[in-house]
Amino acid sequence: MASLVAYDDSDSETEADPARSGDAAGQISDASGMSRPSGMGFASSTVGVTKEGAQHTGNSPNEDPGMQRLPLARLWRSDPGSCPSQRLQWPSKEPDTTFPPSEPPRPSLWMSRAPVGHVPLAAACLKPLKPAWDVLKPSHDQSTFESTAGNASSSQRKRGEDCVLPYIPKRLRQLQALNPEAGGGKDGEPPGPPAGCAPAPLCVAPTVSEFIQPYLNSQYRETTVPKKVLFHLRGHRGPVNSIQWCPVFCKSHMLLSASMDKTFKVWNAVDSGHCLQTYSVHSEAVRAARWSPCGRRILSGGFDFALHLTDLETGTQVFSGQSDFRVTTLKFHPKDHNVFLCGGFSSEIKAWDMRTGKVVKGYKATIQQTLDILFLQEGSEFLSSTDASTRDSADRTIIAWDFRTAAKISNQIFHERYTCPSLALHPREPVFLAQTNGNYLALFSSVWPYRMSRRRRYEGHKVEGYAVGCECSPCGDLLVTGSADGRVLMFSFRTASRACTLQGHTQACLGTTYHPVLPSVLGTCSWGGDIKIWH
C-alpha cells in the first residue's frame, strides 16, 4: 500500500519514488489519486508554486531527451538544509493552506454570521461602532479548518468517482437505523426531549397568518367541501388519537395532536405544515389533549395517570396532578377556565381546580369507563358517554349531569345497545350528535328530556370499536365523521344525505375537525399516525 505522505529524498533525486511520479504532462500524482502541477509540493509549513511549473509543457527544461530525471529545484521546501531525520519529525505547526479543491470551499459551519438584513438592536439605536480588529481578521485556526474541510470534501468527491463508499461510523449507522424518517423536510421531525424534560422554548409569531387575516373581521361564510390534500403531516410514531385547532382565531394556524407515542405536538398546519414543537411530558400514551381557552397552554392526560397543563412557549408545567385512573377524556369548563372535567377507566368523573391543584367534585355512576364528555347550557350541565352496552343499560349509556350539584338529570337518553365513543354539539341548533358503534350518527335534543330524532340518522361509515370522532362545521350545514376503513364522510345536516366521501387514510380515521375561521379547511388524523389537512 502506497504511503499517503510524499517524502523528498535529498540524497538522491533520481531514484523512483513510489508515492510521487512525474508524467509527460508535467504533473505529479500522489498515492491518493490526486494530481497537481510539478511546481507544487509539500513543505514543512507552506506550499510553493513556481512559475515554470504553472506554465510547464511537454518539453520541460528539467528533463533530458534520454528520459532521465534531473534534479528539481527545491522551491517548495522552507528549510533547504533539512536532513531526512528532520523531515520525518512532526511539523512545528499545521500548514496554512493546502491544494485548492475543484470548487471554492464552503464557509465554515462553526462561524456564526448574522443573516442578511439583520440589524442588531444596539446598532439601530446607538451610533455605529468601529469593529474590533480581531473581528475583522480571521483567525489562523478558522482558515486552517476551512482549508482542511475543503480538502476533505475534494477527497470524498474523488472517492465517489472511484465508486468507493465513504466510511460511516457505527454510532451514525445506529442512529440512522433508529430514525429511518430523519430524512428532513416536513415529514421527518427531530425527536422530542425525554419524558419529564421541558422542550426548547417555542416562539409563537405575534403576526397573524396571511391566510387567516382576511377572514378575521368578516362573518363566517358557508362551508365548502374540501377537494384535495394541502399538507400531509408525518412525525408521530403511534396512532393519533385526537386533533384540535387553536380556539383563538388569530392563532388558529396551530394544530394540536395527541398520540399513543407518549407525545403531543403543535403544528403550523396552515402556512408551512411543519411541526413547531414536540412535548414529551408523559411516560405513557397521551389519550387526550386540549387547548386552553386562552390558546397559551395545553392540558393533557394519558395512561400514566398524570395530568399536565403545559405552557406553550416555555414548555414548563403550570399545573400537574396525579389521577387515580387512566385518563381518556378532558374538557374545560366553558365559563370557569380554571376548572376541567377528567374521565377515564373509572366509574367516577372528577372536576379539578387548577388554582388549588385538587379535585373539587366527583360524579359517580355504575360504569367502568367514561368515553367522552360534552358540556351543555354554557356549563351548567354536561353529558357523559360510557361503555355500558348490556341489555339493561338504558340508564348508563349517555348520562346528563348537573355540574354544580353532581346530580343526574337524566339517564334515559339512548336506549339502543351500542356504545357512543364520541359526542359533538351543534354550533347553532339546540341538538348534539352521538357517534355509535352501530355505524351511524344519532341526533339528540340538547335540552331536557334529550329526545333522540327518529327521522334523521347519518350512516354509511364504520366504527368497529375505534374511538371515531365526529364534528359539525362552524356554520352547522355539514357534519363530518371518520371511519374505520380510513374514509372521511360528510353529510348534510338538514337532509342527512351524504355530501362527499374522501379516501383519507390507509388505516382507521379517528379524528376530524373543521377550521374555525377558514371555511374550506379540514383536518383528519388516523390510527396510522399521520395527519392530513384538506382544502
Curated annotation (Swiss-Prot):
Entry-linked CDD domains: WD40
WD repeats: 235-277, 281-320, 321-362, 365-411, 415-454, 460-501, 504-535
Stored SUPFAM superfamilies: WD40 repeat-like (SSF50978)
Swiss-Prot/TrEMBL keywords: Repeat, WD repeat
SMART domains recorded: WD40
Region (Disordered): 1-108, 141-160
Domain of life: Eukaryota
Ranges annotated as biased composition (Polar residues): 141-155
Record carries keyword Endoplasmic reticulum: no
Pfam families in alphabetical order: WD40
InterPro entries: WD40/YVTN_repeat-like_dom_sf, WD40_repeat_dom_sf, WD40_rpt, WD_repeat_protein
Protein name in the entry: WD repeat-containing protein 25
